[in-house]
């Protein structure tokens, strides 16, 4: 399986997003103007369809050396599409291998059965994200507002509903999509930050944050996953 580096392309968007987001609250001193309908259509035509078929995620079980440095990423096949659904443009991910999240759940007695059940789960899941086109030049960029990712797991003598939560673009500058300048290919990034077992109130999530060791580094602020067009 091919290993790639997820974060190398994100920096340009982060800088642009951080700059414009600081200048949207004052109409007299605003650098950002919402896209026109024609510009949104241009963005849609450049991103719509079944373009992104690969998923990249952090994994210290898959290690490669590049230029003397170790990289901890793996790629898998997924089915991802962007289409207009009524008033909204939606990114739909099908065949998502939710078992990859097992490595990010804290290791303790309370989570042992959950982690084992998740590792063994071979049934992929589907989820959606609302797409909001943000920029058409110099790079087409879009915000993402993802639904929770849900799976039913059998363990401990019962069926449990487990939900995984992603930051929206409104809460994380590392959740976004774009068309690359060099090759004109579509890619999207999501930050998954936590999970909840058998939610008491699905309208008011109360997730447990991911907390995991990746190649000797303790991480507790989520993990970024990438969908991309090969």
Spans of model-derived segments:
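Bacterial Sec-dependent N-terminal signal peptides
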Residues: 3-45, 227-228
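Edge beta-strand at a domain terminus
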Residues: 27-37, 164-168, 177-230
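Tryptophan-anchored aromatic micro-motifs
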Residues: 41-66
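Coil residues (strongly favoring Ser/Thr
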Residues: 42, 75, 88-89
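Generic short beta-strand segments
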Residues: 52-61, 95-99, 145-152, 156, ...
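Acidic, glycine-anchored loop motifs typical of Ca2+
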Residues: 61-73, 202-203
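Polybasic, proline/glycine-rich intrinsically disordered low-complexity segments
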Residues: 77, 81-83
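Predominantly extracellular/secreted and cell-surface proteins with exposed
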Residues: 84-174
């Amino acid at each position: 399986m091919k290993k790639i580096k997820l974060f190398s392309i994100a920096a340009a968007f982060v800088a642009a997003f951080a700059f414009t987001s600081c200048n949207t609250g004052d109409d007299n001193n605003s650098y950002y103007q919402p896209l026109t309908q024609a510009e949104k259509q241009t963005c849609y035509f450049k991103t719509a369809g079944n373009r992104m078929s690969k998923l990249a995620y952090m994994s210290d079980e898959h290690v490669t050396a590049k230029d003397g440095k170790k990289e901890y990423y793996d790629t898998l096949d997924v089915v991802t599409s962007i289409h207009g659904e009524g008033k909204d443009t939606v990114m739909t991910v099908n065949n998502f291998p939710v078992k990859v999240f097992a490595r990010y759940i804290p290791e303790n007695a309370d989570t042992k059965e959950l982690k084992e059940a998740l590792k063994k789960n071979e049934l992929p899941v589907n989820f959606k994200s609302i797409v909001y086109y943000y920029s058409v030049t110099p790079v087409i960029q879009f915000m993402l507002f993802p639904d929770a990712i849900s799976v039913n797991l059998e363990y401990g003598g019962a069926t449990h509903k487990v939900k995984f939560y992603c930051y929206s673009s409104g809460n994380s500058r590392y959740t976004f999509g774009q068309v690359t300048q060099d090759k004109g290919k579509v890619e999207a990034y999501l930050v998954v930050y936590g999970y909840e077992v058998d939610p008491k109130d699905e309208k008011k999530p109360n997730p447990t944050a991911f907390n995991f060791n990746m190649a000797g580094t303790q991480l507790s602020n989520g993990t970024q996953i990438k969908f991309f067009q090969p």
